Amino acid sequence: KGNSTYQPNQTKNPWHIELDTYKNQDYQGFTDIKLSNVAKDPSFLREVLSYKIARKYMVAPQANYAVVYVNGNQIGLYTSAESINKSFVDRYLYSRKGAFVKCNPPAGAGPGTSSYPDLVFQGNDSTNYYAAYEMKSDAGWAELIHLMDTLANDINAIEQILQVDQALWMHAFNNVLVNLDSYAGGFKQNYYLYRMKNHQFYPVVWDMNESFGKFSMTGTINLSSTTSKAQMTHLLHANDASWPLIRKLLSIPMYRRMYLAHMKTIINE
């Protein structure tokens, strides 16, 4: 676990523990434990607080703190976030057999990355998308491509295949919390899409360790100061074709009003 927070020579590394050695093994009902070493957050608040806020408005992982010991030696205080897997979508979205997509480049995102999970339609050949998305279900590429095609070419039909209100909540959340290591930022990543029984894709946010302005790359400019982050436009990428899930949704007046209302709700509450 850990794209930028894992270092082989450091003691306090992130952990991803899968309890799959023995059948029916779990810890307090969970079979998958993810522990973040909080490497980029001296406050130790970003991840846990962000998930607490997110869960008021959308499906998102539970999160808390854990003191981690290895072979009796205390390693340190970690944050623990619920893993987004088939058990997660079954628990919250009441299904586990739908198309399930992790929207992160399988090779990781960084300065040299050229493929992003931006939902830009690049034709019907699924191989065009392998470098940007990781399919967690046995099938689902056709459904994901149909979503991108609809965003690009038939936005008025989008509610048939996307839980639009939840997507707008995700955009509002990312903007208010200046959570730019997300779809709203330069790498357009760190979210999942799950296709529910009603054939709508439901977005789920994850990886909050750089929320509240720690990550500064919007994809168009770098917010290098606290002031620039505090004053970030509420319509970030509303007119940018490289972010179709923002641009296309906010091009519809009703959706834009819903998005702004969601932002106001998060700020007020």
PLM-predicted stretches and their roles:
Residues 1-44, 49:
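Conserved NTP-binding catalytic cores of kinases and kinase-like/nucleotidyltransferase enzymes
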Residues 1-2, 67-72, 208:
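Short, solvent-exposed turn/loop segments enriched in Gly/Ser/Thr/Pro and often Arg
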Residues 6, 10-11, 127-129, 133-269:
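Middle-to-C-terminal accessory/interaction subdomains
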Residues 7-11, 26-29, 61, 70-74, ...:
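Extracellular/periplasmic catalytic domains that process cell-envelope and extracellular macromolecules
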Residues 15, 33, 66, 79, ...:
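Residue-level detector of short, conserved catalytic/binding motifs and their immediate flanks
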Residues 16-24, 37-38, 56-65, 70-177, ...:
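Internal "kinase-insert"/substrate-recognition segments embedded within catalytic cores
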Residues 22, 40, 86, 106, ...:
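Short, glycine-/Ser/Thr-/acidic-enriched flexible segments
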Residues 45-59:
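Zn2+-dependent metallopeptidase catalytic core
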